[in-house]
């Protein structure tokens, strides 16, 4: 199966589990907002990036060439996978109207410093400003795919961020669950404060320890996933209204893969999750496994 991707790790990692798959075009680290008004100026230092892949992705974002790269390969493509992971960091809006995706790679190349000097501002994901620009960008992307005859070959991977690590229960999102997490943090703080008093710390230091309890890794993942899934809601609904085919998973249905090749993150899942996604993807495409 010949695959094109406009997205990031959710789609790319899924491809590793698709039988006989071949990724012929991969557009990553690029928000759809930069398609219409890309920077088109060589004012970022791509030389600081050690990976040729990273350099190509930032260069593509600066050129706004993501849609064209896929359309130019239309005859070689069996399926186009879309996901929204790379929208999560927002984009830089420059005073001349141009935009740069706020990827980690672009930041390493100096986009933040350039933006500060140029009077640009960061348009954060989830804001009304971001959403309005994103809607126009996504409509433009899908129109390009449709014109190239790829609309029926496009599948949206609508996979919510996982709120729990592999082997753990999904965190409760109601008030009882929230109060339970807060109570556990208070108990950890109390134990830490008690130990500090026993070890000779003063009352002020112990009180500070009690107040400033660090969240556990699991709690941080749960909080990040809950907030991101909330912000993604209207974006996902919009994609579903435009793209006919989709594979969806809610947060409670997936888990963070502890042994994921790129490390544990709410958008890095277990092998069994990817296998399940692939099974549904093949059904969407009218194909059987194998």
Language-model features: where?
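Extracellular glycan-modifying ectodomains
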Residues: 1-290
